[in-house]
């Protein structure tokens, strides 16, 4: 019997889908190339925004017409639970019960409904999950959940409280992957720099990075996503200490106004955020810092917005993920705050920040012209060019062929834009 997993949302969902595939294949189920070839279609879902939720709910309706067995995992499973049965779903798996997915599939084949939400994270045998969606790169979840409870965010309710994996288990996974051709890893967590705090044994992200950089064949180490007050300068020192650790730090700020930050329950002031960025840049002068910002949060005034503009102008992020605020059912903001910023104003403010960031990107990228950088080749783009990233997470495109994927090359930059950089391969390293 064949299954197909359709993944929505974040990188952690990508990793969870790899885990689910492993457990199903261990029980003899066969992975299909697409949903049309599959007897069972499993949707690994996202509900961070309403649009993402609507998308997978629409897919359920389409699959019902094709008479497929339907399973739902991910944050949508946690949010909607057994209510999904009313939509024709056959089984639902919680974010911490992925190792039990064969049990749910078996029950659905027998015509029974299955809903499994137990915390079975400790059962996951990550050391033997060697089949990844990329041959040279692996997503590695090191901490689950989030304790921060930002007022706009559904994640603590769908992913639970923070729970770290043992460091030895993570390092064994990385070593096994390195022996299987993986050269690049990304450590994942909703709040990755909180890693180890719940273990109460001195474990930390900085110590994990220190041990990981010693593993032979691993050429680049990434991590995301960070929370400002959990980001220790020991992490920055580890980045500065090794050419293996990417000089790319994703540090969501969400807003430039202290009033709005407090309303978001972000637990830091904008002055503290500025000071953190200053300290990071003192330790890692060439650090590439990216961020997230929400536009149009309840009670955001023009003055609040201008403080965000000032933040973006002064810090000059290398990359900025922008989102217009929309209430998410189940969050504190949805329950208690009026969504009182008109849509037209939200859209105008969003457009202004998009244009501002585009100009910043263009200016920052111009400094790359005629430079030679190390790139790990990822894949072919739709344009036909191949692309990869340098140690600062710049996307660089070039002429190449399939044999280069996963290899480290030197590229001389010949053209810059506000987005990708373009260059010529100098040599394979």
UniProtKB/Swiss-Prot annotation:
Its main location: cytoplasm. Pfam families: Radical_SAM, TRAM, UPF0004. Keywords: 4Fe-4S, Cytoplasm, Iron, Iron-sulfur, Metal-binding, S-adenosyl-L-methionine, Transferase, tRNA processing. It is an enzyme of class 2 (transferase). One of its GO terms (cellular component) is cytosol. Binds 2 [4Fe-4S] clusters. One cluster is coordinated with 3 cysteines and an exchangeable S-adenosyl-L-methionine. [4Fe-4S] cluster 1 binds at residues 10, 46, 75. GO terms for molecular function: 4 iron, 4 sulfur cluster binding; metal ion binding; N6-isopentenyladenosine methylthiotransferase activity. Residues 1-110 form the MTTase N-terminal domain. It catalyses: N(6)-dimethylallyladenosine(37) in tRNA + (sulfur carrier)-SH + AH2 + 2 S-adenosyl-L-methionine = 2-methylsulfanyl-N(6)-dimethylallyladenosine(37) in tRNA + (sulfur carrier)-H + 5'-deoxyadenosine + L-methionine + A + S-adenosyl-L-homocysteine + 2 H(+). Residues 132-364 form the Radical SAM core domain. Disulfide bonds: none annotated. Its cofactor is [4Fe-4S] cluster. Catalyzes the methylthiolation of N6-(dimethylallyl)adenosine (i(6)A), leading to the formation of 2-methylthio-N6-(dimethylallyl)adenosine (ms(2)i(6)A) at position 37 in tRNAs that read codons beginning with uridine. Monomer. PANTHER family: CDK5 REGULATORY SUBUNIT-ASSOCIATED PROTEIN 1, MITOCHONDRIAL TRNA METHYLTHIOTRANSFERASE CDK5RAP1. This is tRNA-2-methylthio-N(6)-dimethylallyladenosine synthase. It comes from Thermosipho africanus (strain TCF52B). The gene is miaB.
């Amino acid at each position: 019997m064949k299954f197909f997993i359709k993944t929505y949302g974040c990188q952690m969902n990508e990793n969870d889908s790899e885990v689910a595939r492993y457990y199903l294949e261990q029980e003899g189920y066969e992975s299909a190339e697409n949903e049309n070839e599959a007897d069972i279609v499993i949707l690994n879902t996202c509900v961070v925004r309403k649009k993402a939720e609507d998308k997978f709910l629409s897919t359920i309706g389409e699959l019902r017409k094709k008479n497929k067995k339907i399973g739902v995992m991910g944050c949508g499973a946690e949010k909607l639970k057994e209510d999904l049965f009313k939509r024709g779903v056959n089984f639902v798996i919680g974010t911490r019960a992925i190792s039990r997915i064969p049990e749910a599939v078996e029950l659905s084949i027998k015509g029974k409904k299955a809903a499994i939400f137990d915390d079975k994270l400790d059962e996951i045998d990550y050391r033997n999950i060697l089949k990844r969606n990329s041959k040279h790169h692996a997503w590695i979840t090191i901490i689950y959940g989030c304790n921060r409870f930002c007022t706009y965010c559904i994640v603590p309710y769908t992913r639970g409280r923070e729970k770290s994996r043992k460091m030895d288990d993570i390092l064994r996974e990385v070593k096994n992957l390195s022996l299987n051709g993986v050269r690049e890893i990304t450590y994942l967590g909703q709040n990755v720099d909180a890693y180890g705090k719940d273990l109460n044994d001195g474990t930390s992200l900085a110590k994990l990075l220190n041990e990981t950089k010693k593993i032979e064949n691993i050429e680049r180490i990434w991590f995301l996503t960070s929370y400002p007050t959990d980001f220790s300068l020991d992490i920055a020192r580890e980045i500065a200490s090794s050419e293996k650790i990417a000089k790319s730090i994703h540090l969501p700020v969400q807003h430039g106004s202290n009033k709005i930050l407090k309303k978001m329950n972000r637990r830091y002031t904008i002055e503290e955020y500025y000071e953190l960025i200053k300290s990071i840049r003192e330790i890692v002068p060439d650090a590439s810092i990216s961020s997230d910002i929400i536009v149009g949060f309840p009670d955001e005034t023009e003055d609040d917005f201008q403080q965000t503009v000032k933040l973006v102008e002064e810090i000059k992020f290398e990359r900025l993920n922008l989102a217009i605020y929309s209430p998410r059912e189940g969050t504190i903001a949805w329950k208690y705050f009026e969504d009182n910023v008109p849509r037209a104003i939200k859209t105008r403010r969003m457009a202004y920040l998009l244009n501002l960031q585009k100009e910043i990107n263009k200016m920052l990228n111009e400094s790359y012209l005629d430079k030679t950088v190390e790139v790990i080749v990822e894949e072919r783009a739709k344009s036909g060019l191949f692309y990869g990233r340098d140690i600062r997470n710049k996307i660089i495109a070039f002429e190449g062929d399939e044999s280069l994927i996963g290899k480290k090359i030197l590229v001389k930059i010949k053209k810059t834009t506000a987005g990708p950089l373009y260059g010529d391969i100098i040599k394979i390293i």
